[in-house]
Every structure is written in structure tokens, then in C-alpha cells.
Amino acid sequence: MKTLLLTLVVVTIVCLDFGYARTCLKTPEVKSEPCPPGQEVCYTKAWCDRMCSFRGKVIELGCAATCPRQEPGKEITCCSTDDCNTHP
């Protein structure tokens, strides 16, 4: 009986991924990092500032609990797999 119980405990630990955290690309360095607990959405925000005609749109990449709200003048896209918010 103890052997069966021990086997079930080991199988449970192996099957459950206790330390999993979503990873998203984050700015300013544009590198993959684990998201804080509860933040399972990766997002990309893009917008023009006064330097847009010279250097292109400003890009912000990160994690969120939910997809950020649309804002005037900002393009926001969201996804929910690891590192899915690639730089446009």
C-alpha cells in the first residue's frame, strides 16, 4: 500500500508543473522574461511619437493579467503563448 501511495505522489509531482510561468518578450531590452504570477497575457503596444517620422513607432512589449484596453493612437495586440509578442 505504501508503494502505491508513493508511486501516486511521484507521478503527481512529475505531471504537475508547479513552477510554470508564462514568458513574454519585454522592453526596453527586447528579451524573454518570466511574467509575474497571474499575468498570462503577452502584449505589444505600438504608437507614433514626435520622432516617428525619423525612427518609426515606439514599441512596448510586456505581460499583463488581461489584454490592455485600446487607446486612441495606439495599436495593441495580445496573445497567450510563450514569447508570442514578437517585435513587429
From Swiss-Prot:
Provide the alphabetized UniProt keywords.
Answer: Acetylcholine receptor inhibiting toxin, Disulfide bond, Ion channel impairing toxin, Neurotoxin, Postsynaptic neurotoxin, Secreted, Signal, Toxin
Q: Which domain of life is it from?
A: Eukaryota
Disulfide partners: C24-C42, C35-C63, C48-C52, C67-C78, C79-C84
Q: Where in the cell is it found?
A: Secreted
SUPFAM superfamilies, A to Z: Snake toxin-like
Tell me, in one coarse class, where this protein mainly resides: secreted
Keyword Signal in the entry? The reply is yes
Segment forming the signal sequence: 1-21
> Which is a Gene Ontology cellular component entry for this protein?
extracellular region
Q: Name one GO molecular function term.
A: toxin activity
**Which tissues does it occur in?**
Expressed by the venom gland.
InterPro entries associated with the record: Snake_3FTx (IPR003571), Snake_toxin-like_sf (IPR045860), Snake_toxin_con_site (IPR018354), Toxin_cobra-type (IPR054131)
Indicate the family of this protein: Belongs to the three-finger toxin family. Long-chain subfamily. Type II alpha-neurotoxin sub-subfamily.
Q: What does this protein do?
A: Binds with high affinity to muscular (alpha-1/CHRNA1) and neuronal (alpha-7/CHRNA7) nicotinic acetylcholine receptor (nAChR) and inhibits acetylcholine from binding to the receptor, thereby impairing neuromuscular and neuronal transmission.
Q: What is this protein called?
A: Long neurotoxin LNTX-1
Q: Which organism is it from?
A: Demansia vestigiata (Lesser black whip snake)
